[in-house]
Amino acid sequence: MNYNKKSIEDIDVKGKKVLVRCDFNVPLNEGKITDENRLVGALPTIKYLMGKGAKIILCSHMGKPKGEPKKELSLLPVAKRLSEMLNKEVIFADDDNVVGENAKKAVEDMKDGDVVLLQNTRYRKEETKNEEVFSKELASLADVFVNDAFGTAHRAHCSTVGVTNYLKEAACGYLIQKELKFLGNAVEKPERPFVAILGGAKVSDKINVINNLLDKVDTLIIGGGMGYTFLKAQGYTIGNSLVEEDKVEYSKEMIDKAKEKGVNLLLPIDNVVADKFDKDASPVVTEDQNIGEGYMGLDIGPKTAKIYSDAIKSAKTVVWNGPMGVFEFKSFANGTIEVAKAMADSDAVTIIGGGDSAAAVNILGFGDKMTHISTGGGASLEFLEGKELPGIAALNDK
């Protein structure tokens, strides 16, 4: 995949109508935004375009309205909050069909530096099917397309891919540019030693990632629920731990592949277990890899955490995707905390691949110590799998 894409700085936007696909899929509680990280992330691109005298038309999805208007998924709260953040009114074009009379009039009346926000793109059923009719309507409002929504870059939708068939200038905003820089370098030309850490519940979610990364990394660390399938593959007992029986054979193949490639594959050597999946369950640390009958693994053990931390400390590039245990339960958060600490203390380029690991790092207060926290869980995973992301591929090459 070519990561060298035109950015907003490579195109002339003065006086032009610029359609910007943002990721404003923010959590709401009674119409109030409870986490505005995604709005903050979009500001540099919007402010740059304002400063250059562009006419800025913002669009985004929110939630899953499944192709029909749902009042609770309206982008009105986003327009209000953005107006405050930009110190400038963001005109909300409230059309159930997204590109309706309100949108057309708002765009027609725009002066250089003005900002309009369209209604939730997923109010239209065509959006997720990437159907021409809606792509054409969106494109008809603008002269230039800018994609700054990395979180949906792995989806071929009207507002991420379809519009580029009708707008010949298509560039990335600052958010996507940053993602391409850090994730692209990690995958293509990492500074070594390159360590990848994979956690989370399921091997099946990470099959292609494990396979692809074994061709690239010096050390691969496995933790979280998926670790128990690997332990079973090595012949250890795992009690009542989460296991994917149909992935045990695959895990054996990956252990062999790591040996062949000379990759240091690190798996748990001790575990924190309990007799039930409960925040109040009493944690017990196992002597070794084996987990007794009636117990389930809920975190990596202290010896494992030490080995993983040491591997991180000697790295020059670290990519982390997925927690080491059930970090929402205090008794089983230590593995995740130790990994986050080791990354925070490291001089390496440290990249967090969105989703649960990003949440964990932010909750633990290590966010500002990481080189880059990806804004897309699914998109960053597909990136690490080596897949081409349609929303990136559709942009102009430099």
UniProtKB/Swiss-Prot annotation:
Substrate binds at D23, F24, N25, R38, H61, M62, G63, K64, R122, R155. Its EC number is 2.7.2.3. Pfam families: PGK (PF00162). The keyword Transferase applies. Its main location: cytoplasm. ATP binds at K206, G297, E328, G354, G355, D356, S357. It is found in: Cytoplasm. SUPFAM superfamilies: Phosphoglycerate kinase. Monomer. This is Phosphoglycerate kinase. It comes from Clostridium botulinum (strain Langeland / NCTC 10281 / Type F). The lineage of its organism: Bacteria, Bacillati, Bacillota, Clostridia, Eubacteriales.
